[in-house]
Amino acid sequence: MAFKVVISDKEKSVQMEVDPSESRGLIGLTIGDEFDGSIIGLSGYKLKITGGSDKNGFPMKKTVPGARRIRSLVSGGVGYKPRRDGERRRKTFRGNTISDDIVQINTVVIEKGEKPLEELLGADEE
């Protein structure tokens, strides 16, 4: 399955779709891991995984190990904003490991390459 990778930089965020053949290098990585951008066609860039969501829209959570899906009682943080003080709710989260069920991966640029992102992804945005 193809991944949608959101790449955030200080100036701008861009989204690109990664082919299934290229995305094999991302399977098994967890939130907080850094990887070389050449895996997804961004040579010279170094990216850090900050989150994502699965095929049903459930967010990945750093504190949930593995690629499983759980229902957790939360009072704030990732995936839930309480309306009143002390309010808690049971929410579904995806684990912190990238698997075939993940659709969107959020990343942030750690090291920039020689070419700007817009130049590398120019053909994809048109």
UniProtKB/Swiss-Prot annotation:
GO molecular function: structural constituent of ribosome
Gene Ontology cellular component annotations, sorted alphabetically: ribonucleoprotein complex; ribosome
Keywords, alphabetical: Ribonucleoprotein, Ribosomal protein
Pfam family, one: Ribosomal_S6e
Nucleotide-binding as UniProt keyword: no
Ribonucleoprotein among keywords: yes
Gene Ontology annotations of biological process type: translation
The family this protein is said to belong to: Belongs to the eukaryotic ribosomal protein eS6 family.
Family matches, as HAMAP family: Ribosomal_eS6
UniProt xrefs under PANTHER family: 40S RIBOSOMAL PROTEIN S6
Name under which the protein is recorded: Small ribosomal subunit protein eS6
